[in-house]
Curated annotation (Swiss-Prot):
Cofactor binding comment, as recorded: Binds 1 zinc ion per subunit.
Name of the gene: rpmE
Keywords: Metal-binding, Ribonucleoprotein, Ribosomal protein, RNA-binding, rRNA-binding, Zinc
Subunit structure: Part of the 50S ribosomal subunit.
PANTHER family in UniProt: 50S RIBOSOMAL PROTEIN L31, CHLOROPLASTIC, LARGE RIBOSOMAL SUBUNIT PROTEIN BL31C
Function as written in the Swiss-Prot or TrEMBL entry: Binds the 23S rRNA.
One record GO biological process: translation
Family to which this protein belongs: Belongs to the bacterial ribosomal protein bL31 family. Type A subfamily.
Name of the protein described by the UniProt record: Large ribosomal subunit protein bL31
RNA-binding found in the keyword field: yes
Length: 67
């Protein structure tokens, strides 16, 4: 490898808006993210499932689409 050509690969702190801090390695010094696996609804099990079956049925009735 040539000297001075490649970026430095160093320890990085990834800080989430929820306060969670993840230490990893990267060429970027520090990162701030809005959402992480500790607070994302998909990973915490608090996600909301949208039931669109009623809307689809209403659309099909309105336009008389048989399915």
């Amino acid at each position: 490898m040539k000297k001075g050509l490649h970026p430095r690969y160093e320890e990085t702190k990834v800080v989430c808006a929820c306060g969670n801090v993840i230490v990893t390695a990267s060429t970027v010094k520090d990162l701030r993210v809005e959402i992480c696996s500790a607070c994302h609804p998909f990973f915490t099990g608090k996600q909301k499932l949208v039931d669109s079956a009623g809307r689809i049925d209403r659309f099909n009735r309105r336009y008389k689409i048989r399915g």
